[in-house]
Amino acid sequence: MSLRPSTRAELRKKIYKTGVDADEARRRREDNLVEIRKNKREDSLLKKRREGMMLQQQLPLGAGLDGPQTAAAVEKRLEGIPMMVQGVYSDDPQAQLEATTQFRKLLSIERSPPIDEVIKAGVIPRFVEFLGRHDHPQLQFEAAWALTNVASGTSDHTRVVIEQGAVPIFVKLLTSASDDVREQAVWALGNVAGDSPNCRNLVLNYGALEPLLAQLNENSKLSMLRNATWTLSNFCRGKPPTPFEQVKPALPILRQLIYLNDEEVLTDACWALSYLSDGPNDKIQAVIEAGVCPRLVELLGHQSPTVLIPALRTVGNIVTGDDSQTQFIIESGVLPHLYNLLTQNHKKSIKKEACWTISNITAGNKLQIEAVVGAGIILPLVHLLQNAEFDIKKEAAWAISNATSGGSHEQIQYLVTQGCIKPLCDLLICPDPRIVTVCLEGLENILKVGEADKEMGLNSGVNLYAQIIEESDGLDKVENLQSHDNNEIYEKAVKILERYWAEEEEEQILQDGGNDNSQQAFNFGNNPAAPVGGFKFA
């Protein structure tokens, strides 16, 4: 019962640059990449709710379908629409109920329900009228169910329900004396809010949140908890986001919901928290103060990916905040869970999300980088940087590069001992200019430490890390970047070469006979000092 996402949104809000502060190094989610995953995830849940739950799961009053819906049976039903319309518009309550129930069953068939045909029959205004029949809750329920399924279709279908004035009536039905009517109103409002941010705002502006939250209590049956949590997640989702003050009252209820053991409730409650935590630091702080972090971290060990993914997304959003907000998550015990996500057999999207989360922790202060080091995360991170699919490599590159930016001399030395140089060099030929820049910056930060060691007389007066870069074919790759289309990459490559390899180039020119033409740096004389294949600078 989850809804299609909004269009793919902004790029990373914070683009990492050498020497920037930690807030700039931290990255909000790059919606260009993740909205695709969201799209698949949410569309599949929408279909599952609309089709699967109708057919298989418990329904109010035990009202299910009357057996398999063959094409011939559906066609026969469609032929009966004129008679059904007569029943809906009759003055006999029993005829009204029977005809409305027939329409509801028609709208509940598993494959391609005939929503357009039902709308064309002109019965939607009558169904909305039936919502007000408090003397006949069974009729209210059947009309609400039919309208719910109309609203589950396209945006045009949802608009028909809205334009007939159903939304404020559904909001009133959230306080109905009938459990079944209340639950169907919850579902209907979830479908309307799920259509678009404008529809979501319309529902909220009719005052739906407070009576919806009232459905989420210890006396509610499981089907109500599931439906109401899903609807609540639709109230919180979408771009542009819901005005935060409007949905902030949901936080205490969400804190209670994430301690339940039902997978559906957990999934939708975690998605709601992921939407609420996606934004500026004041939103993140409100989520932290709601007391959800310890349980979210615990859910990173949940066996179901449908729960794990939104819990991880929320944790990842929280660590895009400031150092103190990141520290709160660290102290909640997140790092051992992130280690497990990197090293165990999880699917690609989870490993990618875990690397993204780590990259925002390594964008923090030295103590936070040290916590990542202490949790043993660097080695599996480097392994993914070297061997994983490109999408994971990109996030791992951010994580390592951020650590080189804010890390101490000793921490950067440790990164090198874990083998980070070669995979950073290998990514210099990747097609994503942002990642090339990130890797160049990481290598530059490493070279600075190697140079400092050299100036202190260590490593026989050699920049050991420059040597490792050469041995990893990194020097050739950096040299090739001098002809890169991206000006920032070109300038950074030139700067690195001039700072760390110009000395050797000058030596080569001198040994080549003093020819300083950089385009013709060849030795045309008989210089016995020149080995076959040119010089190797160690």
Swiss-Prot record:
Q: Whereabouts are the ARM repeats?
A: 112-152, 155-194, 197-237, 239-278, 281-320, 323-363, 366-405, 409-448
InterPro entries for this protein:
ARM-like, ARM-type_fold, Arm_3, Armadillo, Importin-a_IBB, Importin-a_IBB_sf, Importin_alpha
UniProt keyword list: Nucleus, Protein transport, Repeat, Transport
Q: What residue ranges are annotated as transmembrane?
A: none
Gene Ontology terms for molecular function: nuclear import signal receptor activity
Q: Which GO terms describe its cellular component?
A: cytoplasm; host cell; nuclear envelope
Principal localization? nucleus
Record-annotated IBB domain positions: 1-58
The Gene Ontology biological process annotation of the record reads: host response to induction by symbiont of tumor, nodule or growth in host; protein import into nucleus; symbiont intracellular protein transport in host
* A Pfam family reported for this protein in Swiss-Prot or TrEMBL: Arm
> Which cell locations does it reside in?
Nucleus envelope
Function of this protein?
Answer: Binds to conventional NLS motifs and mediates nuclear protein import across the nuclear envelope. Acts as a cellular receptor for the nuclear import of the virD2 protein of Agrobacterium and is essential for Agrobacterium-mediated root transformation.
Subunit organization = Forms a complex with importin subunit beta-1. Interacts with A.tumefaciens VirD2 and VirE2.
| Family to which this protein belongs | Belongs to the importin alpha family.
The name under which this protein is listed is Importin subunit alpha-4
The organism named in the record is Arabidopsis thaliana (Mouse-ear cress)
Q: Which gene encodes it?
A: IMPA4
